[in-house]
Swiss-Prot record:
Disulfide bonds: 15-18
Organism for this UniProt entry: Methanocaldococcus jannaschii (strain ATCC 43067 / DSM 2661 / JAL-1 / JCM 10045 / NBRC 100440) (Methanococcus jannaschii)
Xref: InterPro entries: Thioredoxin-like_fold (IPR012336), Thioredoxin-like_sf (IPR036249), THIRX-like_proc (IPR005243)
Keywords: Disulfide bond, Electron transport, Redox-active center, Transport
Active site residues per record: 15 (nucleophile), 18 (nucleophile)
GO molecular function: protein-disulfide reductase activity
Protein function: Does not function as a glutathione-disulfide oxidoreductase in the presence of glutathione and glutathione reductase. Has low thioredoxin activity in vitro.
A Pfam match: Thioredoxin_3
Protein's name according to its UniProt entry: Thioredoxin
Family: Belongs to the glutaredoxin family.
PANTHER family the record matches: THIOREDOXIN
Length: 86
């Protein structure tokens, strides 16, 4: 199996919802055992370029969640689907 690297961006200003989203993404990546770079985007101007409501999550340049805390299972499902299409 070819390992595909994915950059996962978490958009948020450090609020509890954004921090929980980060933890859920981290856990999903660990459970799937995938190669991922997880980046916290906290600059308000950069966040505004990507999402209207935080927290937000993007895989590479694709927004997959916005304005909610995705569960670990939701993240895993989206990641698997995304990586199958790469």
């Amino acid at each position: 199996m070819v390992r595909v690297m994915v950059v996962i961006r978490i958009f948020g200003t450090g609020c509890p919802k954004c921090n929980q989203t980060y933890e859920n993404v981290k856990k999903a990546v660990e459970e799937l055992g995938i190669d991922a770079e997880i980046v916290k985007v906290t600059d308000v101007n950069e966040i505004a370029e990507w999402v209207f409501v935080t927290p937000g999550v993007a895989f590479d340049d694709v927004i997959v969640f916005e304005g909610k805390i995705p569960s670990v299972e939701e993240i895993k499902e989206e990641l698997k689907s995304y990586l199958e299409g790469k």
